[in-house]
Regions:
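Active-site cavity-forming subdomains of large catalytic enzyme subunits
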Residues: 126-204, 208-217, 227, 244
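Hydrophobic helix-and-loop "lid/oligomerization" segment in the mid-to-C-terminal part
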Residues: 5-135, 154-156, 174, 182, ...
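Short helix/loop capping segments that flank catalytic or ligand/cofactor-binding pockets
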Residues: 89-90, 147, 170, 245, ...
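Conserved beta-strand positions in the Rossmann-like core of class I SAM-dependent methyltransferases
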Residues: 107, 160, 539
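Short, glycine-/Ser/Thr-/acidic-enriched flexible segments
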Residues: 85, 142-144, 166, 191-192, ...
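Mid-to-C-terminal polyanion-binding domains and interfaces
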Residues: 70-74, 316-322, 326-360, 412-586
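Short, well-ordered strand-loop elements centered on a beta-strand within folded domains, enriched
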Residues: 175-178, 183-185, 392-400, 523-527, ...
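Catalytic domains of riboflavin
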Residues: 1-3
Length: 586
């Protein structure tokens, strides 16, 4: 059973509310997001692009641009090597368009997920050399490509790295020894010597900052770099970066830009997803548009997604966009089957004792391993690796919980992998098939997770009676957007809510509506999108079958609930009303 926690962070909420013209509840939520002090609150509410740090603070940023501008002047052949996910596609798009604007002789290559794997490899370096490429520029990859970059340097090539992933290291007797490549310049805010104040940038944001420095260097108006702000925002949300600090500013600016997008490919994708440009928010980036871009890298080639955004003909853009949507539909079906198989294995093969799950699904397409890992992590609240058979052994992806730094834990058994990399919350790996069971054993031996770490935790912003909620307050919550990682939609809790009626609706009978009455007698319209059968089982066990039947018929009963809820304004036939979405109950 999940534990409910109320955020108890202190501040003078009345003073904050008065100073910034917001309700005390809104002020409390902002404090719960770790925003402290008037300057920080002002940036949270009113942050502008002009408030973000100078990209010149990025270690090697100016050096990279000095080299790149000279290569452009020399008409040297430059190749951008990106990645096959949304961040890699957007990073590549930004650099290709910007370098062409700067007069560069530039092309691009996005690795094939199955044939090439993640990031740089020797094959891609050799192909670039055969094609007469002088300079390789990486984006959203390269920080861990130590051997591959060494190979490129042996061939006499220039290598410029832009990345945002964790810097690889060896753990020698508890001391981290960071690895460095022989690249001519490395730009990554996670480097120890990097003085850039905000570290949580995605690859596209790092690439965009290089564009700003490049335009500054060669005399192009820096304002032109704002042409890419919607791509930066798209990648930031799609790559599940924290929507805090600078990222929050970038995403807000990007959403404003996309409401008036001129990109033919983006317009086509919006049309195929039945979304009006002026209605796009972070949810659409993360859960509708982003998965369509990622689906190409998973099941086909991410080059197709990049071609969509580079496209200048509407007919072609609509064709590609419709293909992306169809691929994503296929991905959804494959994912559902993979999750079902993983659950069967967990329940059959004594995985309950494992604190870290390593599940081998040889028949699952390697591109959806990460999605399946995320679903299994959500179900069991355990760090999860999903492994699958590949052309040269086993590949996999991991998704973690807050209490477990996945990449650091993998470093403790790095000898088992042929390749690995990632973040605290996610990772990718390759290993020989004979190491699969050993990996499961070792990663669990090293895990120091406690029983409490593995209990799901529900964080409540404010314990607030539903009676306090008003249309005005819910409307005000829009100042908290965009919502996403580290800035979730606010949730509240109330108790002693009596169920007067409950009934199932929806085309697939997968939505539960409830009429509730507060302890003060206020009638409430509520909705629940979770597991309805589990909810019904709880009601029967806790209150009895008679009460359950009475509630379904709208008759008096003894069912009283405590709920975690999120209020919103429901619009039906142009009429607005308050609706309470139940997240959890007990």
């Amino acid at each position: 059973m999940a534990k409910w926690y109320v955020s108890a962070k202190k501040a003078d909420f009345a003073a904050i509310g008065a100073k910034f013209g917001i309700d005390q509840v809104t002020a409390r939520i902002i404090r719960n997001r770790g925003v402290i002090g008037d300057d920080a609150v002002n940036e949270f509410l009113n942050g502008k692009i002009s408030d973000i740090a100078d990209p010149a603070l990025l270690k090697d940023g100016q050096r990279l641009v000095d080299i790149l501008s000279q290569k452009i002047a020399d008409k040297a052949k430059i190749r951008i090597i990106g990645d096959y996910d949304i961040d890699g596609v957007m990073s590549t798009y930004i650099l290709v368009k910007a370098l062409k604007r700067a007069g560069a002789c530039v092309d691009y290559m996005i690795p094939d997920r199955v044939k090439d794997g993640y990031g740089l490899n020797v094959h891609l370096i050799d192909k670039a050399y055969e094609d007469g490429i002088d300079t390789v520029v990486t984006c959203d990859n390269g920080i861990a490509a130590i051997e591959e970059i060494a190979h490129a340097k042996e061939l006499g090539m220039t290598v410029l790295v832009t990345d945002h992933h964790a810097v690889p290291f060896e753990d020698i007797k508890g001391i981290k020894i960071y690895k460095e490549s022989k690249a001519d310049a490395v730009v990554n805010p996670h480097q120890i010597e990097c003085s850039y104040p905000y570290k949580e940038l995605c690859g596209a944001a790092v690439a965009w900052k290089i564009v700003i420095l490049l335009y500054r260097k060669i005399g192009i108006d820096e304002k032109e770099s704002m042409d890419f702000i919607e791509n930066v925002a798209f990648a930031t949300v799609g790559d599940v970066m924290p929507l805090t600090g600078e990222n929050r500013i970038l995403v807000k600016a990007g959403l404003k830009s996309i409401h008036h997008t001129t990109n033919i490919g983006m317009k086509a994708l919006l049309e195929c997803c039945n979304i009006e440009a002026e209605n796009v928010d972070a949810y659409h980036f993360g859960f509708v548009l982003g998965p369509c871009v990622n689906a190409t890298g998973r099941l086909d080639t991410a080059k197709r997604a990049l071609e969509l955004f580079l496209c200048d003909r509407q007919e072609e853009a609509m064709r590609i966009a419709s293909e992306l949507v169809a691929l994503n539909d296929d991905r959804k079906e494959m994912t559902a089957k993979g999750v079902e198989t993983a659950v069967e294995i967990y329940e059959r093969d004594n995985y309950e004792k494992d604190r870290v799950l390593v599940i081998y699904l040889p028949d699952v397409h390697e591109s959806i391993a990460g999605i399946i890992a995320g679903r299994i992590r959500e179900k069991y609240n355990k760090p999860t690796f999903i492994l699958t058979k590949s052309e040269d052994g086993v590949k996999g992806s991991g998704r973690s919980i807050e209490e477990y730094s996945m990449y650091e834990e993998m470093c403790k058994c790095s000898e088992l992998f042929t390749k690995f990399g990632g973040h605290p919350m996610a990772a990718g790996l390759s290993l020989p098939q004979e190491n699969v069971e050993l990996f499961r054993q070792k990663i669990n031996e090293y895990a120091s997770l406690t029983d409490d770490d593995l209990v799901p935790k529900i964080h409540i912003d404010v314990p607030m009676p539903v009676d306090y909620v008003s249309m005005r307050l819910v409307s005000e919550f829009s100042v908290l957007a965009p919502f996403g990682k580290d800035n979730p939609k606010p949730v509240f809790a109330d108790k002693n809510l009596r169920v007067s009626r409950m009934w199932v609706v929806g085309k697939n009978n997968n939505v539960l509506r409830l009429s509730l009455i507060s302890s003060y007698g206020t009638p409430i319209n509520a909705i629940y999108f979770g597991d309805i059968e589990s909810f019904f089982d709880y009601i029967r066990q806790r209150f009895g079958s008679d009460a359950f039947e009475a509630a379904q018929r709208g008759r008096f009963n003894n069912i009283v609930l405590s709920v975690v809820y999120s209020p919103k304004i429901n619009v039906f036939r142009e009429n607005e009303s308050l609706q309470f979405e139940i997240q959890y109950y007990k």
